[in-house]
C-alpha cells in the first residue's frame, strides 16, 4: 500500500467518509487555551488571538496528516462549543445565559444557551472564512467542515419568536437557511460536510421518549419531523458534495448525557435519511447492538462505526475492534463500513480527559486497524 512521508498508510477512497476517519473536534492546545483566556480578559486583540488559532490549526492539520487521516479538520479550535458558536451566528438567533448548564452524567456544563428572536436565515457567517482557511492548508487532503444539524436549533433554541409557534413556518425558514449555508460552504470549496446531532438521543431511551410526551409531542411524529428537516435541508446539495451526520449521546469532559440503542428510531435513521454517511457511537454498551443496522436499505450509505472511544486514552484491543466490525458486517455489507472514534475529543473547549499524545495515538490506531481490515 502507498505510504506518505511519515510512513503511515495513505487511506484513500474516491469520496469520504474514509475507511479510517474521525468526527472532527480535537483537544485544544494549552497555548490556545491561554490565548482565548487572554482575549477574554482584554489582554490581547482579536487579531492576535486569530493568529494563534491559525498557527495551532496549521499544527493540528499536520498532525492529522501524520496520523494517516485523509480528512482533516480545524479541530474546532475557533469554537468554545461544537454547536452554539455556529447557531448563534444565524440571523434571528441570539446567545443568552440560562439559569444552569446542560445536565450530563454526574456533572453539568457551564451555562450557555441560544434563543430564537427573529426570522432565521443564513447570511454573513464567520465560519465560512474559518473553512476557507482550512481549505487552503489542507493540501492534497480533504478539508472536512463540521456544523450542527438544523435539528439542534429546534432542540436547543428557546423560542421567543411567535410566528414559529407554527412548526411548519419554522421548518420552512430553518431548512431554507441551511440550504443557503450548504451552498455557501460548497462555493468556498467544501466537498465534505458533517452535520452533528444530539437530538436523536431523545428517542433512544424510554426516559427520553417520556420527556417528549411531557412536552406535548408524539415521539414517532417528532422523529419523522427531524428526518424531514434533515432531508429538506440537504435536498438541493450539489452531487459532488458529501454530507454525513454524526449522531451523539453527549460528550463533555469524558461524560455522557443519554443512553440507549438505535432500535426505537432505527427505521427512520437507517432507512429514512438522505445523507451519504452516518457516524455512529458504538464504543460501549450504552449504544446497544448492531441489529438496528438491518434497516440500512441503500448500498451507497456509508456506516462509520465509532468503536474507538474518545473519552479515555487507553487503546482498544485491535482484535476486539476487528471482531466487532465483522459482527456489524452481518447486517451491512463490509464495504459500506468505516471506522472512527465515537465522538470528537473536545466537543467543548474543556476537552475530554486524555492527553494530546493519547489523542494522536487513538487516531493512528484507527488508521492502522482500518488499513488491516479493508486494505490488507
Briefly describe each language-model feature range.
Residues 1-376:
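Domain-level signal for soluble alpha/beta catalytic cores
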